């Protein structure tokens, strides 16, 4: 080893120590999560929930559109029917170990029953615990759309009224009257 190589090596070490010393007092980029809350954008897509309508009933009508729209196939459900003809999911299951939180299920839902919330704390120790059933997904409130009630808008919630007499619903069109 020559003297020149020793001086170059020594200079490299001094430069490295100098840079470490400069960065030791710089502002830290790492956030200490539990103590310091993380900013989430307004449209952040996190945990999926099933909401209820303002009357307290489930919004989901088991139309299966969310399961069809899901690109990874992590949603499964089975339709059942009540005495008054309303559909509801007998079981509703989401496998969060497969979910990519794309939000296509929320867009496909005609009743706004399935919604993505900003909750992201879903860590589990076993994969089996990431399979959520309907009881785990249902929340007590209406979520993002507090006044929306699918059956009231569709004309099925009010007993004794015909189609076209619900809120914000146009009267049925008599197709024969349009003929020449």
Curated annotation (Swiss-Prot):
Cite the EC number.
Answer: 7.1.1.-
Q: Superkingdom of the source?
A: Bacteria
Cofactor(s) listed: [4Fe-4S] cluster
What sort of enzyme, by top EC class, is this? translocase
Q: Which family does it belong to?
A: Belongs to the complex I 23 kDa subunit family.
Listed under subunit, the entry gives:
NDH-1 is composed of 13 different subunits. Subunits NuoA, H, J, K, L, M, N constitute the membrane sector of the complex.
Describe the task this protein carries out: NDH-1 shuttles electrons from NADH, via FMN and iron-sulfur (Fe-S) centers, to quinones in the respiratory chain. The immediate electron acceptor for the enzyme in this species is believed to be ubiquinone. Couples the redox reaction to proton translocation (for every two electrons transferred, four hydrogen ions are translocated across the cytoplasmic membrane), and thus conserves the redox energy in a proton gradient.
Q: Which NCBIfam families match?
A: NuoI, PRK05888.1-1
Its protein name is NADH-quinone oxidoreductase subunit I
Q: Which organism is it from?
A: Shigella sonnei (strain Ss046)
Q: Which gene encodes it?
A: nuoI
